[in-house]
Amino acid sequence: MIPELGRRPMHRGNEDSSFGDDYEKEIGVLLGEQQRRQVEADELERELNLYRSGSAPPTVDGSVSAAGGLFSGGGGAPFLEFGGGNKGNGFGGDDEEFRKDPAYLSYYYANMKLNPRLPPPLMSREDLRVAQRLKGSSNVLGGVGDRRKVNDSQSLFSMPPGFDQRKQHEFEVEKTSASSSEWDANGLIGLPGLGIGGKQKSFADIFQADMGHGHPVTKQPSRPASRNTFDENVDSKNNLSPSASQGIGAPSPYSYAAVLGSSLSRNGTPDPQAIARVPSPCLTPIGSGRVSSNDKRNTSNQSPFNGGLNESSDLVNALSGMNLSGSGGLDERGQAEQDVEKVRNYMFGLQGGHNEVNQHGFPNKSDQAQKATGLLRNSQLRGAQGSTYNDGGGVATQYQHLDSPNYCLNNYGLNPAVASMMANQLGTNNYSPVYENASAASAMGFSGMDSRLHGGGYVSSGQNLSESRNLGRFSNRMMGGGTGLQSHMADPMYHQYADSLDLLNDPSMDVNFMGNSYMNMLELQRAYLGAQKSQYGVPYKSGSPNSHTDYGSPTFGSYPGSPLAHHLLPNSLVSPCSPMRRGEVNMRYPSATRNYAGGVMGSWHMDASLDEGFGSSMLEEFKSNKTRGFELAEIAGHVVEFSSDQYGSRFIQQKLETATSDEKNMVYEEIMPHALALMTDVFGNYVIQKFFEHGLPPQRRELADKLFDNVLPLSLQMYGCRVIQKAIEVVDLDQKIKMVKELDGHVMRCVRDQNGNHVVQKCIECVPEENIEFIISTFFGNVVTLSTHPYGCRVIQRVLEHCHDPDTQSKVMDEIMSTISMLAQDQYGNYVIQHVLEHGKPDERTVIIKELAGKIVQMSQQKFASNVVEKCLTFGGPEEREFLVNEMLGTTDENEPLQAMMKDQFANYVVQKVLETCDDQQRELILGRIKVHLNALKKYTYGKHIVARVEKLVAAGERRMALQSLTQPQMA
């Protein structure tokens, strides 16, 4: 073993040589010393065991090269450790164990010709090709790419994030005692499946076991926050020696690939859906969501903040080329600290598929601002390697919040200055009483703010004011981005899931963002919410399997937004970033998640309209509690909300009928400021109508005054026209006249409107005729036209009913009588003729019947005119009725007109009406004519109707005759 010797990273160039002569000499020395040491079987097994991560599954690339040496070139030199064993086959341990080793597979295929006695590996050649394919695009100069030292226990994965250097020895002992059974059956070291229940320890288990120990401050504290914790963090941070800042811009030789499944896929381009994970504050597989700067620029995302990879080829490149750049020149102590920092930043840093740019060690507090400013300037000059807003990453994230142990804008790369500016602008200094620590409260705002800047403001350290120019573009993307800035925890059902992980007081939540759309909960969340949604009365909604806009969108913070009513959005009862969709805004929430402003603990999606809010707790309680009897006084302060709700509106209408004066005054005071809005509301208009009916007289007058100057637009509105009609019915005459005059010049427009015609009809009914002369005079010369209009025909009928002025009547009737036949056959005009027959004067009926004489059979066979003929039979006098019957019977014994009418689909109803309305003598005459044709009528569909009616009449006549015969002898 070679303790404390770190390998210096080196980038591959375009030439064939992988490294220079100096490095070849150094590597030769290291390999020679390593070869001279004979490792016992148990030591070798321990060494191999250290190569696998105790915190997360290693990459396939790393597993292949881990046991074979860190500087392999594909030949037998990397596998000299296998050649120095104690057994005859050249192995120092059990054959079965080494045959499971993926490094042995490469060794076998490289040396099988030199040593035919080598036992075959347990991995097929096809699996090897897949592993080599995943490895081929890596720019690591051999090795796993995780900066582990050769045969050194100081490997990154031997000390997971959250462990300080005092815990390394204990962790090594635990790793040494681990049995070889941790090797998976698929031959990959520490590569469990994606399923639940792997044998390997998770980060959560390690954190829980290490709760009592201090942690060095990286950028993310890894255990629940307390004052002592931050004190320890600051002390630990101050104890760290400054390490050299690494260069910016050069591609990094360190890469990680995400574990895609329990076994190697035969396809080198794995399905990106396999990487989807729960967007909870949990640790994610190494490498998920990481894309190098060069690759990121060529990635086409669905939205500005969508971190998902759209192409499977991009995913392959990302898996093998996810970089963390760095430079050499680190001392041994700084190397160890940076190794730990690299993994910690990787595990807790950007998760959103944004570019991971060059990470830096912790500088001293005295020179933080100077270094950060220079490095930020450098990062702006190098747009290809640094994260910018154009790439979706924002300001270079490694320089954010250098003076803050907890911050919550890591996902989109905003520096503290921009964050605090947004906090000031959007009022994120309203914290929920649920979260008691400053860290949780700081993450409650939708923009996220430093926990030590509760009121917003600028952070001096690490600040570059030039980057605040990106705020406008960032705000535009927030307002218009399809994926939205959402928080999964804003969903109260998600609180149960989050609470089970004990996350509310964890400061690491501040920076644990799931920006990558493929890191969203596609399986676990839907399964969980599917079972939980029934508790809240709303089914789970989702789009396609790839849709991340419902409960799965990239989040903008781990904590929900401010629950208080937002001062920039006074009409919304919630804060600004809710993940709830438009169809779910009225879902019932637990009362514990509500606050005094009527909002819900959560945020409001920015693409929702301003009038889409969540109902108040009072309204929700009213709708959910069916047994309790509410009174009007109990909903004080919520009358407008109740009026806009279906059940709340009905409740107010019922209570207003028997309300006291005080209750009416309370309702009146609340609805008056919103009267016009309620008049056009689907449910609110009924409350206004009911108040016109049952309100106090002064209140009705004041409410009617609200209508002035708005009569025409309200008359043309679906719900407003109902309020206008009710007002015309109940308000005082002077107000009626004033309201009606607003329609002057717009009468014909209102008559032809589906809503306005009702207002005109109500004016004709309720306003004295002398006050609506301008309406009636508009109809002169247009009576026939209006009579054939679907809405105008109703207005003409109201005129015939309520206008009794002789001059008006004569003018209207003259136009109608001149076109009786045409109107009788019109689909709307026939109603006007029927109205005249029913309500007109006798001489007017006679004129109409005479006009139809000679055309009765023809009119009876017409769909609309047949109704007019029936009205003539119903309302005509005996002489007029006899005249019509004789025309139907005809002049011959065959009764041809009658036969034609009985077989017609419309005229047969006229014949039935004749049998109902004529006297007994005429009925007997008609029945005698019909009986002759009964057998023939049974063959026709409509003739059967006549047969059935005749049979009933005959049966009724026979019974009547029988009764008469029985009563006559008794009388005698």
Swiss-Prot record:
One of its GO terms (cellular component) is cytoplasm. Residues 219-228, 236-246, 299-314 have a biased composition (Polar residues). The keyword Repeat applies. PROSITE patterns: PUM (PS50302), PUM_HD (PS50303). GO terms for molecular function: mRNA 3'-UTR binding; mRNA binding; RNA binding. It is found in: Cytoplasm. One of its GO terms (biological process) is regulation of translation. Keywords: Cytoplasm, Phosphoprotein, Repeat, RNA-binding, Translation regulation. Gene3D superfamilies: Leucine-rich Repeat Variant. Sequence-specific RNA-binding protein that regulates translation and mRNA stability by binding the 3'-UTR of target mRNAs. Binds the APUM-binding elements (APBEs) in the 3'-UTR mRNA sequence of CLV1, PNH, WUS and FAS2. This is Pumilio homolog 2.
